Amino acid sequence: MESTMESTATHVSHEAISGGICSDRYEIEVPLDHFGNDGAGEAVKVSFRVLAGKSSSQDKYLLFLQGGPGFGSPAPWTASSGWIKAALDKKYRVVLMDQRGTGLSTPISCRSLEAMGDAPAQVAYLKHFRADSIVQDAERIRESLGVRSWLTLGQSFGGFVSVTYLLTSPGSLEAVLLTGGVCIRAC
């Protein structure tokens, strides 16, 4: 059973980047426990950026799911080269999500874990930072942007998250691209 908490993204900042690229940063509050098993209604913040070029379409979105786990999304000023530039040139808006626990999203640190108490309490908290929860966060972001479906690009651990997305919410995906270090085995 998935959580019914309604999530609305809050616009935090707008930044012009070289080459006519714009970066808009948002935050969205999502349930700590999307599946209603525990968490007592706690929420975490997920931060994301939407990069758009001069000719980006209003309905073509690419969600980048970075490797790790534990790394924030790429810096938006890298948008003028590499794969981000290629996606923008193909008129996609690129969504860079700081997965829960990383970057500008609600962080996980030694200090925050110690404050939770013993190891079982820490494990109970950390189980909400797996791929299935990241997929649900992405779904909340997609819905808040009013996007029917999008393309995902999963790099390394992000590829694992993309495959999890494909298995749990295939109707939300236009296509899935995987790169680097993904081992897919039968469950």
Over which residues does each language-model region extend?
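Gly/Pro-rich cap/lid or specificity-loop segments adjacent to the active site
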Residues: 5-187
